[in-house]
A protein has these predicted regions:
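A mid-sequence interfacial segment
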Residues: 83, 97-110
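C-terminal capping region of solenoid repeat domains
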Residues: 1-7, 11-12, 20-23, 128-130, ...
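Conserved hydrophobic beta-strand positions in leucine-rich repeat
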Residues: 23-25, 48-52, 74-79, 101-106, ...
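Leucine-rich repeat
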Residues: 8-18, 37-45, 64-72, 91-99, ...
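Alpha-helical adaptor scaffolds
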Residues: 51-70, 76-98
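LRR N-terminal entry segment and analogous cap-like coil->beta motifs
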Residues: 2-62
Length: 161
């Protein structure tokens, strides 16, 4: 899908948002444009779980999601198998919208050591219990940053490289 095209996001949301607040749009290839459109949908104000794996979302799409006031109720954010780098991890780490987030799944991206360090320094993500960074090439230093972070006080499930 090109940068200017994305599926009809509003209709996808209306069809796929459950009464319980879960939106599963995995493998829809919505890209950064679709992520930005999602971020602007007031319909998602009560969403608690956002499943966006395999969607070709990069750092600018992540930035849009992170700046959305409509996603502040999320407890689960699944961005597995996208195109997220250290910059996207930094957006996530600095976003003030994730105070309710319990699970962050970023496996199969490219955040690297630098991205892991951004997450480890986050003052916002301290309440998460699950962090999945499998296959992100974070290396020993990135893994150490996550494991030794004083900010992850509730972390009980961690999956690293």
């Amino acid at each position: 899908m090109s940068d200017n095209e994305s599926p009809d996001i509003k209709n996808l949301v209306l069809k796929n948002l459950t009464d319980g607040g879960t939106l599963n749009l995995e493998n829809r290839k919505i890209g950064d444009v679709g992520a930005a459109q999602l971020a602007n949908l007031e319909t998602l104000a009560k969403a608690t779980s956002l499943e966006l794996g395999d969607n070709e979302i990069g750092d600018s799409g992540v930035a849009a999601l992170c700046s959305s006031s409509y996603l502040s109720q999320l407890r689960v954010l699944n961005l597995k198998s996208n195109q997220i780098t250290a910059k996207g991890a930094e957006h996530i780490a600095l976003s003030e919208n994730w105070s309710n987030l319990d699970q962050l799944i970023l496996k199969f991206n490219q955040i690297g050591e630098e991205g892991a360090k951004h997450l480890a320094k986050s003052q916002v993500l301290g309440q998460i219990s699950t962090l999945d960074l499998f296959r992100n090439h974070i290396g020993p230093k990135g893994a150490h940053a996550i494991k030794s972070s004083p900010n992850f006080t509730r972390l009980s499930r961690v999956r690293l490289d």
